[in-house]
């Protein structure tokens, strides 16, 4: 399980180095094989270990290509999906189109989300966190059924 936010740098070839604390688990769980795609709601990327991505693909195959909304989701997620494999130094190459979608330049944030990572431009990440905190402080939100019973 992935948790926490880590500041990383992209090298000149568009590679990011996976933090050491995740490398061993990724090597064991998926032999360093991952899939990266766009987040369709946020300016970030979603980086999945291959077994987790295969679960997403199974769900996507059950969608109808005749339904415009379902076809759109398939097109966006699968059309941007890119296989990535950690090299011996724990680095992953992010394709130029993926980097462009998330506005990735030199500094980025790798954010653990239990079964996947989000990859953000560092400034965009800090802006998003500030916005999320403002919404929580203002109390201007509606709890859905799953959040009503959630407690920290």
Curated annotation (Swiss-Prot):
Its main location: cytoplasm. InterPro entries: MraZ, MraZ_C, MraZ_dom, MraZ_N, MraZ_sf, SpoVT-AbrB_dom, SpoVT-AbrB_sf. One of its GO terms (molecular function) is transcription cis-regulatory region binding. GO terms for biological process: negative regulation of DNA-templated transcription initiation. Residues 5-52, 81-124 form the SpoVT-AbrB domain. Transmembrane segments: none annotated. GO terms for cellular component: cytoplasm; nucleoid. The keyword Cell cycle does not apply. Pfam families: MraZ. It comes from the Bacteria. Keywords: Cytoplasm, DNA-binding, Repeat, Transcription, Transcription regulation. It is found in: Cytoplasm, Nucleoid. PANTHER family: TRANSCRIPTIONAL REGULATOR MRAZ. Belongs to the MraZ family. Forms oligomers. This is Transcriptional regulator MraZ. It comes from Idiomarina loihiensis (strain ATCC BAA-735 / DSM 15497 / L2-TR). The lineage of its organism: Bacteria, Pseudomonadati, Pseudomonadota, Gammaproteobacteria, Alteromonadales.
């Amino acid at each position: 399980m992935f948790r926490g936010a880590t500041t990383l740098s992209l090298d000149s070839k568009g590679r990011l180095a996976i933090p050491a604390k995740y490398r061993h688990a990724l090597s064991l769980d998926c032999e360093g094989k991952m899939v990266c795609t766009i987040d369709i709601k946020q300016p970030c990327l979603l980086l999945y270990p291959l077994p987790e991505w295969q679960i997403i693909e199974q769900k996507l195959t059950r969608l109808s290509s005749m339904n415009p909304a379902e076809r759109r989701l398939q097109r966006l997620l699968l059309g941007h999906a890119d296989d990535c494999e950690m090299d011996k130094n724990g680095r992953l190459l992010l394709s130029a189109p993926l980097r462009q979608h998330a506005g990735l330049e030199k500094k980025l944030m790798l954010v653990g989300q239990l079964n996947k990572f989000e990859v953000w431009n560092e400034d965009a990440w800090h802006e998003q966190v500030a916005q999320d905190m403002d919404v929580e402080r203002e109390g201007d939100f509606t709890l859905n059924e799953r959040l009503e019973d959630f407690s920290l």
